[in-house]
Amino acid sequence: MHRQFLSSRCQNLFFKFKLLLFEVNQMQYVYIFIGGALGALLRYLISFLNTDGGFPIGTLIANLTGAFVMGLLTALTIAFFSNHPTLKKAITTGFLGALTTFSTFQLELIHMFDHQQFITLLLYAVTSYVFGILLCYVGIKLGGGLS
């Protein structure tokens, strides 16, 4: 009985994956890929602002910029992207997904902890979270005013 349940779940997941991969607008994948490549390139260039052992300003800038733009685009979606969902996915999932980097942020916090840089760790974490939420909110409000 348990084996039959798992088999039907696997078939259901496979069907959903097949549906996503082959029956969705396939150009969407190309746009997300291009957006992701551009976001990753910008993220790489911004990372040069980081210094060894110093405050990771490049990661902070990338993440806060991404939070603001994501908020802005959330509000502008209705006005400007309703007829262009593929472009919205290219910008949000592709570009902003590659630009912002939660995993690097976490790794930098662990690095600070390992090097007993507790003040810097606290400052970085609080700044990232508080200003990330604030900038996302400002982006939503600004975008709402523009649409």
UniProtKB/Swiss-Prot annotation:
InterPro entries according to UniProt: FluC
**Any GO BP:** cellular detoxification of fluoride
Membrane-topology annotation of the record: Multi-pass membrane protein
Metal-binding listed as a keyword: yes
Q: Which reaction does it catalyse?
A: fluoride(in) = fluoride(out)
Transmembrane residue ranges: 29-49, 61-81, 90-110, 118-138
Keywords, in A-Z order: Cell membrane, Ion channel, Ion transport, Membrane, Metal-binding, Sodium, Transmembrane, Transmembrane helix, Transport
- Sites binding Na(+) sit at 97, 100
Which compartment or compartments is the protein found in? Answer: Cell membrane
GO cellular component terms, semicolon-separated: plasma membrane
Q: Say which family it is in.
A: Belongs to the fluoride channel Fluc/FEX (TC 1.A.43) family.
Protein name, per record: Fluoride-specific ion channel FluC 1
What is the species of this protein?
Staphylococcus aureus (strain COL)
Gene name per UniProt: fluC1
